[in-house]
Amino acid sequence: MLSTLALTGCQIESSTTTTATQQPSVSDASHYQSIIDAAQGKPSMDVLRVYISQEPLLTDPAQHQANIDSLWLMLTQMKPEQIQGIEADENILLGWVDLLDIYQNNKDDPEALRTGIDDWKTRYPHNPGAKNLPTALVQGTITKVGANPRIALFLPMSGQGQVFGQAIMQGFLDAQKGLPSSPVSQASTAPAASQGSGNDVLDQIYQEVAATVNENANTEVASSTVSIDAVPTNTQSVKVFDTQGKAMPQLVAQATSEGYNLIVGPLLKSDVQAIAQMNAPVNVLALNELDANQLQPRTNLCYFSLSPEDEAKNAANQMRLEGKQMPLVLVPASPFGDRIAKAFAEEWQAKGGGTALMQTFGSTASLKESINRGQGIRMTGTPINVATQGVEQANGSIDAVYIVATRDELTLVKPMIEMAISSRQRPALYASSRSNQGNSNADYRFEMEGVKFSEVPLLAGANNNLRKQAQGKVNNDYSLFRLYAMGIDAWSLANNYDNLQNNGQFRVNGASGMLSVHENCVIYRELPWLQFKQGQVKPAQ
């Protein structure tokens, strides 16, 4: 039965024209897929013919590439004695078999393989592989980056994304020159009278005065527990490509023709998706991350971003380390808030926690209306639904709250929480870096007493000389500080690119976090925690 259906497909494939009565349809593609599924991956010439017949009917780029990738996988799994009986009019099938021969003869020599593929394309210009090579074959043509990669930096250098692209570029190029050394911690230089006096009132007065004197300065954190590693050296010139309004295939072709063997970028998610779908024949460190269902293992594609989901996972880990049992996630009422809550819950349960709860809040105006009516935020919520099985519903009162809010929102949310609870039931409060905007005055710091928040090492006291250097480059804009830190770490990752795919133990203390590599070569950032304490910002205890 399989043979008969496959040969029927072969007749459609071998026709050079399609009449009105033979117009292919979605049902034809589904019919061929049912034959493929029935074969259960068992290699055969008949199933190869079905793949070939199905290919021109697939209009979705992802499905089309999947067809080619599956055909190639099956072809590489076949024994030589299975590849026989090719008819004279089966030019497509003959082309694939010829390409297999080129691959097997040159798979250990990427340059020779590329040359062989180029020659093959001229001989089989109508083969679907001439336009869309199998992903595994493309990856076989890519050489390692090496210790001194030639880097093409893909960033928006004009248009609305220009300010973000420039901040990343500045950090990237400054890292190439080397980072300034970290100064000796100033944590031990306070007057002796304020240390160990045992007089809490005098200590607080001293700290408040010191904070007020420096109110207009950028609050620095002196931390000996957070560090930023030295960056690799590479004297190769870096070329910046403006991605604004440009098509990724043309930019990639230009970069590779000019001899660049590593692309860092692009930044915009739509561009990252385009470069992933085009199966680019070059190593790529994308500066954004695709959704989980779009990620696929590629030996030449890694993802690095300032992911707020990573911060949520950090918060879940921190609460578990501190022995918290019943967390509430307080997020904006938006798809963004839903994503953050889900990321927190998944990590919380992965670390052995029960079901986490979620509550949303509205705009700043609605928060002000609520606080004017004396309406607080009660410690209740709805369970966050994640795919984890067998997780028990946690019982008891809320003992920790993770707040994802802007600074203006946090100044309303914190007192609203305190309005609705008694002092004996006060939960620990944790916030994301979203609320830390810098230049906070003494009143704000005292108002936020006890709140812990995550922040990138560059802003958490790891290297205040580097922070001062960045301050002059980004006009003291905290959001741009973080992008500058991302640029520094992109440089470190780019110059360690070969280790990212092959070393699950890879770690680097970066300016944007402690970096490690997770599945599908996604870079994960672990952030340090700070805390508002007696009018100052200090490393969290």
Model-assigned labels for residue ranges:
Residues 414-488:
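Extracellular/periplasmic periplasmic-binding protein-like sensory domains
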Residues 11-14:
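Bacterial signal peptide processing site
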Residues 259-268, 285-287, 328-332, 380-407, ...:
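Periplasmic-binding protein-like
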Residues 167, 186, 192-292:
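Beta-alpha junction/loop-to-helix N-cap segments that form part of ligand/metal-binding clefts
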Residues 6-9:
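C-terminal motif of bacterial Sec signal peptides marking the signal peptidase cleavage site
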